[in-house]
Design a protein with these regions (language model features):
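Short alpha-helical elements
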Residues: 1-250
Length: 250
């Protein structure tokens, strides 16, 4: 028998959220959700989903239909708990793209780039003071962290401090953070001649929390390696993983 992930408590949270968004909950809705989580956890193909959950077509059709309607991200934001925003973190992480993710007809919908490690996607993640996901953006792996910084910072509604690594060391980014009434905790590059009065070594050491968040996301093999052709579907997989992390944390 296939291992399941949904406890009664987690399923109740998800089911209530589905109903709030007008989604019909049939008697096999829990099994369909288990099938989608099984795919997320194992990274296997949709056709390999155990029949004991439901036919693989049923699981795929529901996942794809809700992804196209933008429902998975709505579920995440509804299930996301109270954020601890005394300080927040932003960072990026490369994801290797499997050959099965190639071939999407519209290149603009792929978020796949060619970098030194081959074909990659990059997840740009913002987390709260507990290392729990606030939101994220995905781009091709050839996109530098600083290029997505402002979009990512916009997802952080309020915080006292924003902590990031040297990849975000740029004066326009620091100004943008300060304009949001946050203090940037970002180390200077080695060749920088500017003063860094705001830098706090203690707070910067806490940056492992965002790295831990990436580690939790990559426990799901469909996140650790990208198998989805469309950026929309891969993004939805990440939202489901973030949703599950929050449900477990409550």
């Amino acid at each position: 028998m296939a291992r399941t992930l949904l406890t009664d408590d987690i399923w109740q949270q998800i089911q209530d959220t589905m109903r709030l968004h007008g989604c019909y909950c049939s008697k096999n809705s829990r099994n369909i959700m288990e099938a989608i989580l099984w795919k997320l956890r194992t990274g296997a193909t949709w056709r390999d989903i155990p029949q004991e959950f439901c036919p693989w077509q049923t699981a795929y059709n529901r996942f794809n239909r809700w992804a196209s309607k933008g429902l998975w991200d709505k579920f995440f934001f509804r299930l996301r708990g109270v954020l601890d925003q005394e300080w927040v973190f932003i960072d990026g992480s490369y994801i290797r793209v499997h050959q099965h993710a190639s071939g999407a007809r519209n290149g603009s919908e792929r978020a796949i780039g060619q970098s030194r490690g081959g074909r990659t996607t990059k997840i740009h993640l913002a987390t709260d003071a507990n290392g729990l996901p606030i939101d994220f953006k995905i781009t091709g792996g050839d996109v530098h962290d600083s290029q997505v910084a402002e979009q990512l910072i916009e997802t952080v509604e309020a915080a006292d401090y924003l902590i990031a690594d040297k990849g975000y060391d740029a004066e326009p980014i620091r100004i943008f953070i300060k304009n949001k009434n946050m203090i940037p905790i970002i180390p200077m590059r080695s060749n920088s001649k500017r003063l860094n009065k705001e830098f706090d070594k203690y707070l910067y050491r806490l940056r492992h929390l965002v790295e831990n968040a990436f580690a939790r996301l990559k426990h799901f093999r469909a996140i650790a390696t990208r198998f989805d052709k469309l950026a929309r579907n891969y993004q939805s997989m990440i939202y489901i993983a973030c949703m599950f992390i929050w449900c477990k944390a409550k």
